[in-house]
Amino acid sequence: MTIDGDVHEISPFFQVRQTKWGGRACFSNGNIPKGTTVLQVSNFTGTSISYEFRKEVCHNCFAYANAKTMKYKLNYDYLRDLVCNAHYQINPKKFLGAGLWFCSEHCRTSYLQIPNIIELIECYEILLHHFPSMLKRYNYTSEQEEKLNSILISENVIQSSWDEIESKWIPRINNMKSAKRINQLPPTCEDEYCCIRFVCESLFNLKYMDPQCITYRAFNMLQSNELSKISKFPVLLHFQKLVFQTLYILLPSHLHRMLSIPLLRHILGTEYGNAFGLWQEGEASDSREYFGYWVFPEASYFNHSCNPNITKYRKGNSMLFTMNRDIKKDEQICIDYSGVLDLPTVKRRAFLADSWFFDCACERCKSELQSVH
């Protein structure tokens, strides 16, 4: 049976169903020939370009400049028509470019034509303005990180930590004047900066997304891997709180209204295990650059197989999922999560367990394990 009407309409080629062995999977609606693109998605909830690539990757089409800085930035002149008479926290004389770079005039123009994009640009600009001082104060030692990673994580530990933010930290911040709030910004490194931008974009996209659209409904139903991920890396709980605190202090009112602890936890919890890598196009898998990640809720219902019948690839700012062989009706449609299919069975399964929190039981793994024993 299908699990829910909310994700039944993802593709005419397959249905998302509850499996006999637990969990969800995609099953073909009919015979599908090799070469058929069963899903093409461009409605991501959020993207994150790694800090080291922020100037070398186009923020619209994700083209890569081969270690060269993109030629097209934003200056305030491009925003005049977007700002109009509305009150945005963008200083014409001190505009930094919002941390956005583009490969062409076309991509810059396309990005600026996104409805209400000035709101996201404002958030990026505010963050970029404060980031240098936050980074300057970032001095976590390996001993401090080791201490944070030594915490024994449970659902209660995570919940208690957020309860303290809600009951103590938020009321204290709310009672401060704006200038004093800024002094409460936590020290932040490059990884947190990129994650904050990812959450900003996710909040922005969710704000203007039709709640009845398939992307929104699929996002709400995504499985959170919060407990599994933080249990493995307890420092992430501290990381998440820094992200929330920064957003709570800096976000302008139009996106601040979207921010809540449950939504932030769902955004980050579903990113763990559901994000797709942003990879360089047109290069062999062993030589292409990894730029960051993005989340496509509709594409997150494919299960993994070490012998996948789908090949996934990026085309500009879209992801395509194409059959690499013929399949029959009711056959499960699977992708490769790992990119390590050439590894020996034991190492491959260990990598999947560490990275995606499941013990692979695909037909290839079962067959190879039987031959070993």
Swiss-Prot record:
InterPro entries: H3K4_H4K5_MeTrfase, SET_dom, SET_dom_sf
GO biological process entries: methylation
CDD domains: SET_SMYD
SET domain segment(s): 12-338
Keyword Methyltransferase: yes
The protein's Enzyme Commission number: 2.1.1.-
GO cellular component: nucleus
Keyword Transmembrane helix: no
SMART domains tied to this protein: SET (SM00317)
Keywords: Methyltransferase, S-adenosyl-L-methionine, Transferase
SUPFAM superfamilies in the cross-refs: SET domain
GO molecular function: methyltransferase activity
Cited function: Involved in resistance to compounds that target ergosterol biosynthesis, including fenpropimorph, dyclonine, and alverine citrate. Since a deletion in the absence of these compounds does not have an effect on growth, is more likely to be involved in compound availability.
Family recorded in the similarity comment: Belongs to the class V-like SAM-binding methyltransferase superfamily.
Protein name: Potential protein lysine methyltransferase SET6
